[in-house]
From Swiss-Prot:
Catalysed reaction, written as an equation: 5-(2-hydroxyethyl)-4-methylthiazole + ATP = 4-methyl-5-(2-phosphooxyethyl)-thiazole + ADP + H(+)
The species this protein was found in: Escherichia coli (strain 55989 / EAEC)
Binding annotation for substrate: M50, G198
Molecular function in Gene Ontology: ATP binding; hydroxyethylthiazole kinase activity; magnesium ion binding
Cofactor(s) needed for function: Mg(2+)
Pathway in which the depicted protein is active: Cofactor biosynthesis; thiamine diphosphate biosynthesis; 4-methyl-5-(2-phosphoethyl)-thiazole from 5-(2-hydroxyethyl)-4-methylthiazole: step 1/1
Family according to the record: Belongs to the Thz kinase family.
Physiological role: Catalyzes the phosphorylation of the hydroxyl group of 4-methyl-5-beta-hydroxyethylthiazole (THZ).
GO BP terms in the entry: thiamine biosynthetic process; thiamine diphosphate biosynthetic process
EC number: 2.7.1.50
The protein, known as: Hydroxyethylthiazole kinase
Alphabetical UniProt keywords: ATP-binding, Kinase, Magnesium, Metal-binding, Nucleotide-binding, Thiamine biosynthesis, Transferase
Length: 262
């Protein structure tokens, strides 16, 4: 399958839509990344909500523009809340995104993620090892870290996309986005981004938000990858290491939104 490139014009158009629609994103994400995820969405112009209580999750999933399910710090009560939210999302046609953190390394979360796939996610975002494991091609990864190159996971991503109907995002040095028929590659970013916890998880939240936008969902999701890589490059140029990277990264996301509004 040919891998196309995303144009700057496509990315800018998607960011304009993002800022214009300001999606309300229901983030059922892991405990490690909540603040960073919320700040990433805010910097881009979205509205985050971290609603995790089982008694509220279903109700809020019907209100939100999009739902994120991230299994990074999965527990049985949290799984129950996530299941309720996904069931409601399917019923109310709220697009939802799955981030199958460490799915190849641990059985409980692998079984849970496979169960959730029957509720038809709009998007799935993971590293190469996670996507390959979710597709049933390999059980790999070193915890949350990948042991495979993103390009090696393209066939698995295409298969998973065709089986689920989801847009599948494989992140790495180059990000690949596919609907099973088309594929887009996004270059850029910096290795320092992997030294800060939460950049991938935050991207999943932005992907979820992009699934709520009008237009070509594949292009919108690919644009999310582009914004994050752009911001990462800008932040690295201004920072001295991981500690100073985070505020510069959030500033860079904000500046990107200001540029498309100018």
């Amino acid at each position: 399958m040919q891998v196309d490139l995303l144009s700057s014009a496509q990315s800018a158009h998607a960011l304009h839509l993002f800022h214009q629609h300001s999606p309300l994103v229901h983030c059922m994400t892991n405990d490690v990344v909540q603040t960073f995820t919320a700040n990433t969405l805010l910097a881009l112009g979205a509205s985050p909500a971290m609603v995790i209580e089982t008694e509220e999750a279903s109700q809020f999933a019907a209100i939100a523009s999009a739902l994120l399910i991230n299994v990074g710090t999965l527990t049985q009560p949290r799984a129950q809340a996530m299941r309720a939210a996904v069931e409601q999302a399917k019923s109310s046609q709220t697009p939802w995104t799955l981030d199958p953190v460490a799915v190849g390394a641990l059985d409980y979360r692998r079984h849970f993620c496979h169960e959730l796939l029957s509720f038809k996610p709009a998007a799935i975002r993971g590293n190469a090892s996670e996507i390959m494991a979710l597709a049933g091609i390999a059980n790999g990864g070193r915890g949350v870290d990948t042991t495979d190159a993103a390009a090696n996971a393209i066939p698995a991503a295409q298969t998973l996309a065709r089986e689920t109907g989801a847009i599948v995002v494989v992140t790495g040095e180059v990000d690949y986005v596919t609907d099973g028929h088309r594929a887009v590659g996004i270059h850029g970013g910096d290795p320092l981004m992997t030294k800060v916890v939460g950049t991938g998880c935050a991207l999943s939240a932005v992907v979820a938000a992009c699934c709520a936008l009008p237009g070509d969902t594949l292009e919108n999701v690919a644009s999310a990858c582009h914004w994050m890589k752009q911001a990462g490059e800008r932040a690295v140029a201004r920072s001295e290491g991981p500690g100073s990277f985070v505020p510069h990264f959030l500033d860079a996301l904000w500046q990107l939104t200001q540029e498309v509004q100018a």
